[in-house]
Amino acid sequence: MKKTLYTLFALLLTASLISWQWEKTQHPTIDKGEVIECLNMETQQAYQLEASQAKFANLHIAPAVVNPADLLGTIVPFNAADGKPGQAYFIPAKKKSDKWLIVIQEWWGLNDNIKMEADQYFKDLGDVNVMAVDMYDGKVAATPDSAMKLMRGADMNRMVALIQGAVKHAGSKASIYSVGWCFGGMWSLQTAIIAGPQAKGSVMYYGRPESNMEK
């Protein structure tokens, strides 16, 4: 009988510890009043409203520290569709290839962490050109507050022009694939929409989907 009671006590104690640990590691929740309703709003604009939410900012993990000397690619210029120059972190395929992966940054900007992710895709995929577009034109945030300001202040027309320019830079025969995280996840899907028939695949990591089904 005592053995049974000890076993039951141990099970209850274990369950309590697991429950406590679960609660301890939970991310902060967003109150219902802070949720932005944007079903009738342009998707490309809705994410900028999210950037004004403090709890939204708290959900972002600080970027990993990367040694720039270990990076494979270089910064290259290209022509954006608005007539102004753009730039991207670029790793060309080892042999000529019409496959292009467009990588879109998180809300921090085109930092070394995103460049490292681009490098990893290059290593994993092999015969592909990897192009991480600089959506903030050289600006990079180091804190959530500065990232919020960059994301809120980003010019929508400019970012569309950058993606259009990147697709054109890849060439009319290029097969376009895209990937991005959060801010970049939303833009990954927008890249596929902009690329049209050239788009062959798009991966969104916790990004906002397109609400306009006609697109």
How should each PLM-predicted stretch be described?
Residues 1-4:
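Positively charged n-region of N-terminal signal peptides that target proteins for export
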Residues 14-26:
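Bacterial Sec-dependent signal peptides at the C-terminal "C-region" and cleavage site
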Residues 27-55, 61-69, 74-171:
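Serine-hydrolase catalytic machinery in alpha/beta-hydrolase-like enzymes
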Residues 180-184, 188:
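Gly/Ala-rich beta-loop-alpha elbow adjacent to hydrolase catalytic centers
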Residues 190-200:
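Conserved hydrolase catalytic core segment
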Residues 201-215:
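The feature captures the conserved acid-bearing segment of alpha/beta-hydrolase catalytic domains
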